[in-house]
Amino acid sequence: MKLSVGSYDNSTTVDNEAEILADFQQRSQQAYQCGENIMTFCYGESPRERIDWFISAARKMGTIIFIHGGYWQSCNKEDFAFITAGPLARGFDVMLVEYTLAPQTTLTEIHRQIGAALDAIGRQPGLCSPVYLSGHSAGGHLAACWQAHPVADAV
């Protein structure tokens, strides 16, 4: 592990970060290629305010909302589509939420965007309950911030 005291770039602390992300992207590309029931919708006006909804062909067990990580500064929802395979096979729909990254916007605005995304998800016809809010790294932080949102049954 590389140490970078005072750095706000977590990628500098992982020796093989590029290889890990490349693996995520390759497996995620397969998820999009194999996915028959994927719907994308916007929840705001900025180009990154969008959600990919992977709809399970199996019985409806609920919905998992996933907010991607990347230290609020990198990655996108498409990098994490590989996480959909297990939940889809078990009957869960999965929604991948995108948001504008820092420094193009502030953490306050990112937080607001996630709230707007959850509001938009709550208005979607066919939303299957219960709804589980989740995320990785920065996305986990954002999920925790919004755990009391009315659309979320659990985090």
Spans of model-derived segments:
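Short, contiguous pre-domain boundary segments
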Residues: K2-G6
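N-terminal cap/lid segment of alpha/beta-hydrolase-fold proteins
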Residues: S7, S11-A58
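Active-site-proximal beta-strand/loop segments in catalytic clefts of secreted hydrolases
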Residues: I67-H68, V97-T100, H136
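Catalytic nucleophile-loop/oxyanion-hole region of alpha/beta-hydrolase
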Residues: C75-T84, M95-P130
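Primarily recognizes the serine-hydrolase "nucleophile elbow" in alpha/beta-hydrolase
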Residues: D119-V155
